[in-house]
């Protein structure tokens, strides 16, 4: 008697699988027709190993390997094709979604994915790390007192794709820059949105005595904001940060209230602010400067703009570029290049001091492309110079001409054109452009 065997077959659910190097063990389901016995093997065990009987794959390295299932004929079934296989590619990136605890990124790491747990993610001292489509959405919970991303010392962050980082708990920034004396550098072609809590910067330092080193942005699209009393980029409430340098990229920085868009937070300080390139938009909701110092005795170092396109505004009481409201200060303001538009909603100067505050000095040279400054308080504030109730600030020099009044009409200028415009009794704009030879 001739026994006719059934026609057996095997096939994997997926012909190819992509994983990250820290992903958990997995199984690509195998469909079996018949009762044959299957064994599994990996073509490159340095990339991944496979359990010979269950098919569970464990990732051990990066690269590509082929996982093969082999089946044998039985008394009941014959298999014309006795093997099935799929290609496994293991990306060297660290998948945040696969983490089961805190993680310190090392030099060369690529971070990707969405953080699933309430874990602290840090960057090791001196490490260069790529952020590639990450999401860290910190919960506002006192049990998790850390930033969305914490730099332990000097750090270089390259951004690719779209990235979003939010601090945990209200006292912590989206990205905590390293300690005093270190530098955080952000570059790349992607985007980064960094959001701090009520009392912290978007990028910089946190709350009440917190500090950080220097912050440099030279590429990418960076959006940084504080939900309350911190700067968008710089220091948090009653905190400090080092120098802030922007040489390229597109930067949007904002504080909801009391902090500067770029600079210091409420009762806080920051170092020098230098902008030499890029597209920069900075704003304060109330009482802080767009670029400069925040509210209530805050300070910042010198503000220097040599290039790029800069738009800076304060909704009320702070200067567009300069100092915030109520006993705040900034150092020397120098604008020698680029296109600048600075506006104070009320009581502050467009460029200079906020209400009841001071600046060191203002120097604008003939090397600019255009400077436009607007005040919105007629009785005292200057478009470029002093805000309301400022009796102590330094000199204002525009292309070598000393400006001594909010009523200046451009007299004495030889290298710059001067124009005024107004949209109402409180509003006054000065516009400076180079004279064409």
Question: What is the role of each PLM region?
Answer:
Residues 1-92:
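Solvent-exposed beta-strand/loop surfaces, strongest in extracytoplasmic domains of secreted
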Residues 91-437:
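A composition-driven surface/loop motif
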């Amino acid at each position: 008697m001739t026994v006719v065997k059934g026609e057996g077959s095997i096939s994997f659910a997926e012909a190819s699988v992509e994983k990250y190097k820290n992903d958990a063990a997995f199984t690509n389901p195998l469909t079996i027709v018949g009762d044959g016995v299957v064994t599994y093997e990996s073509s490159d065990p340095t990339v991944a190993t496979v359990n010979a009987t269950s098919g569970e794959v464990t990732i051990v390295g990066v690269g590509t390997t082929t996982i093969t299932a082999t089946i044998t004929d039985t008394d009941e079934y014959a298999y014309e094709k006795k093997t099935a296989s799929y290609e496994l590619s293991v990306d060297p990136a660290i998948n945040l979604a696969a983490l089961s605890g805190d993680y310190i990124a090392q030099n060369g790491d690529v971070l990707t994915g969405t953080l699933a747990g309430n874990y602290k993610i840090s960057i090791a001292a001196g490490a260069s790390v790529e952020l590639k489509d990450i999401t860290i959405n910190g919960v506002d919970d006192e049990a998790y007192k850390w930033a969305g991303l914490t730099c332990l010392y000097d750090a270089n962050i390259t951004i690719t794709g779209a990235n979003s980082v939010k601090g945990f708990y209200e006292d912590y920034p989206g990205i905590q820059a390293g300690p005093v004396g270190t530098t955080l550098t952000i570059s790349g072609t992607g985007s980064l949105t960094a959001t701090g809590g009520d009392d912290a910067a978007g990028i910089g330092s946190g709350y009440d005595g917190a500090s950080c080193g220097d912050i440099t942005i030279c590429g990418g699209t960076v959006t940084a904001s504080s939900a309350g009393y911190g700067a968008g980029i710089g220091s948090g409430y009653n905190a400090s940060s080092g120098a802030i340098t922007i040489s390229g990229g597109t930067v949007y920085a904002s504080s909801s209230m009391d902090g500067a868009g770029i600079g210091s937070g409420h009762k806080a300080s920051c170092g020098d602010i230098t902008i030499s390139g890029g597209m920069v938009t900075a704003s304060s909701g109330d009482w802080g400067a767009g670029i400069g110092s925040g509210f209530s005795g805050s300070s910042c170092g010198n503000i220097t703009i040599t290039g790029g396109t800069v738009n800076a505004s304060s909704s009320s009481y702070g200067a567009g570029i300069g100092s915030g409201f109520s006993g705040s200060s900034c150092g020397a303001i120098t604008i020698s290049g680029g296109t600048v538009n600075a506006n104070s909603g009320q009581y502050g100067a467009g460029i200079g001091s906020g209400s009841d505050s001071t600046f060191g000095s203002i120097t604008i040279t003939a090397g600019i492309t255009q400077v436009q400054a607007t005040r919105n308080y007629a009785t005292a504030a200057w478009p470029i110079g002093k805000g309301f109730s400022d009796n102590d600030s330094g000199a204002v020099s525009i292309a070598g001409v000393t400006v001594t009044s909010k009523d200046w009409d451009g007299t004495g200028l030889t290298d710059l054109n001067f124009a005024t415009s107004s949209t109402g009794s409180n509003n006054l704009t000065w516009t400076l452009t180079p004279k064409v030879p």
